[in-house]
Structure formats: C-alpha cells, structure tokens
C-alpha cells in the first residue's frame, strides 16, 4: 500500500520567508480545530519519536533549523540525535506496518515495567516540514547521510529567488472551504469504521483506498525506468539519492488526488507529482554534486572549484579566493598549494602564477 506521509524540506536564505509554511500549517489546523494533528518541533532521541507517535499516531512535525539538527546528530558523542534520525527513517517506511522500539535490558524489571518499555505504534503516519538555510544544511550533510537512506526520503525544495522587499498583505481568515476539507480528510476512513479521534496507537483507522488508474501506473513505471537509467550512469552518491524518488512521487500523487476530491489517482495527478518531484530532485542532485563531499578535504576542494567557476573567464586572485572560501586561509602554504593542484587536476581550471 502507498500511504501519504512525506518529509519536506524548505531550503532558503535567511529572511526569504521559508518559515511561512509553518504559519500556514498552524493557522489552518487551528481554524479547523485540528491542532491535535500538530506534533513537536523536533525529536531528541528515538524514544522521543516513539513517544510522540504513541500520543499522536498521526501528526505533522514542523522543524525549524533542520540543518542544525542534522549537524547536531553528526557530532561525536550525540548518539541520541543519531538514533532519532534512524527512527525517523524507519517511521517513513512503516506506515502500513508496526513501528517498535529497540530492545533494552529488562533484567530485574517488574512485569509492569517490562510492559511499559515495549512500545508499538501500528500504521504510524508521520509528516515532517523542515526549514533550513543552504549554508547550514549543506555543511551539515555528507555522503554518509545519503548512503544511510535518510536524505533520499526527503523532498528537498530550495528557493533560488533573490532577497526581496517585505510585503504587507491583508490579514484574512482561513477560508471555510479549507477548514471543511481538513475536517473531512482528517476523519475519513473506510466504510464501517469509527472516527479517527476514537483510535489509539494500537488501533489504526481503516484507510480509505484510492487506487491508481492504469494510466497513472504506466506513468510511474516509465518514471522508474528513467530513474534507473540515470542511476546507472551516475556516481554512487547521486544514484543513492534517487532510490526513493518514485515512491515519493506515488505518495505525492495520492495527496494531489485527495486534494482534488478524486476517487482514483488519475494520470493528471500522477504526472503533476512526477514533474514536481523530478524538478526538485534534479535541482538537488546538481547542488549536491558540488556541495556534498566525502570529507573535509573533498568539501574544501569542491568549494574552491565552485568559487573559481563562479568568477567566470576573468578568474579570481588568491586573496579573493580566500575571502570567498575562508577555510582556505586556514591552510598552510604547502597544504593550500596541494589543494589547488587537486582542483586544477580534477576540474576544468587553470592556475596562472
């Protein structure tokens, strides 16, 4: 089965308005009396993920400074944050199954204590809306995050718009058509089932099935072929980032179909989802190929090459390059010369002395 929970990430410059998504989500849920669907603003451990889902098996978490959370999880000694990301990965793929906690030693525990340690959430439905700046995000992630499978579960949308003057739009209430839709969709179940608010983590609601049309299946199959062909000609890191693109498109097509009120996922919904996912996937891959590295040296090498590339045919002087890539100035002269030699060898760059 294909469920609708997705992880989204807004990437934009400071002050670009990427936080507006949080405002819209909160305003709409509050107007529809559906704040019970609003989850925490982050997770500190795997137990925190499970506890939140145990209390609210279906919720959306809005996480500001998502890049900082990833950086914290990558820091040495922060195993709890690493475990939280692992549990988020598992929750993404367990929406039709059961999410369980990891095992702990239960020696000398009473039966009541043992029972309290065993947490199971059937059919958890977790959605995440993250926000971050490009600098924080791309400095926090590395090839290992792609290989682990965490990043390819996220639909990353980076805004390329330049900074703009603020606007003063009129304040309006959330339209009734929106609040009515939220109430309807958040309580929709299969025939003969009770209301979603009556359910707990042990009794998931009976889902309403929205089937794929034959035309939609064909489009998704063609997209899978396209993805596979790209993977076969890409580096391992880039290929790994495409592993779940088709599944993300399937989930998004379900969301589009439900938003349109359709009883079937049509070719229109499927094509829209494929186009949306693929556009931002290709944008993300292009950026990651330059900005995500296998280590500190690789990251610095790519940053220097990108800075030289941006200077165009006029080139860039050493003092300008150090200003653009401050980490280069921290190197000793022989280290810097060695790094520049790698850049000249690996990229279409010429050094004139």
Name these PLM-found stretches:
Residues 1-353:
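Phosphate-handling catalytic cores of nucleic-acid transaction enzymes
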């Amino acid at each position: 089965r294909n469920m609708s929970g997705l992880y989204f990430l807004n990437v934009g410059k400071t002050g670009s308005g990427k936080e507006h998504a949080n405002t819209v989500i909160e305003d709409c849920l509050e107007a529809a009396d559906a704040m019970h669907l609003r989850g925490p603003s982050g997770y500190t451990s795997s137990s925190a993920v499970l506890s939140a889902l145990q209390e609210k098996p279906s919720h959306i978490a809005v996480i500001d400074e998502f890049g900082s959370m990833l950086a914290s999880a990558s820091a040495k000694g922060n195993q709890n944050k690493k475990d939280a990301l692992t549990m988020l990965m598992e929750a993404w793929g367990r929406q039709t199954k059961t999410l369980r906690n990891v095992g702990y030693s239960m020696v000398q525990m009473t039966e009541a204590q043992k029972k309290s340690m065993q947490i199971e959430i059937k059919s958890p439905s977790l959605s995440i809306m993250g926000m971050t700046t490009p600098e924080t995000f791309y400095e926090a992630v590395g090839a290992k995050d792609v290989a682990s499978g965490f990043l390819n579960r996220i639909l990353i949308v980076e805004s390329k718009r330049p900074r703009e003057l603020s606007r003063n739009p009129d304040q309006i209430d959330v339209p009734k058509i929106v609040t009515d839709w939220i109430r309807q969709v958040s309580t929709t179940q299969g025939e003969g089932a009770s209301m979603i608010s009556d359910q707990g983590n042990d009794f998931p609601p009976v889902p309403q099935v929205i089937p794929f049309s034959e035309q939609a299946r064909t489009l998704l199959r063609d997209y899978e072929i396209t993805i596979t062909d790209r993977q076969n000609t890409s580096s391992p890191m880039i290929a790994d980032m495409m592993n779940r693109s088709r599944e993300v498109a399937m989930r998004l097509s379900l969301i589009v179909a439900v938003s349109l009120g359709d009883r079937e996922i049509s070719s229109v919904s499927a094509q829209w989802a494929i186009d949306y996912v693929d556009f931002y996937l290709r944008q993300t891959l292009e950026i990651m190929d330059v900005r995500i590295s296998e280590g500190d040296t690789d990251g610095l090498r790519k940053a220097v090459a990108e800075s030289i590339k941006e200077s165009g045919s006029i080139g860039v002087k050493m003092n300008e390059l150090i200003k653009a890539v401050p980490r280069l100035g921290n190197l000793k002269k022989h280290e810097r010369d060695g790094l520049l030699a790698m850049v000249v060898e690996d990229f279409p760059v010429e050094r004139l002395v």
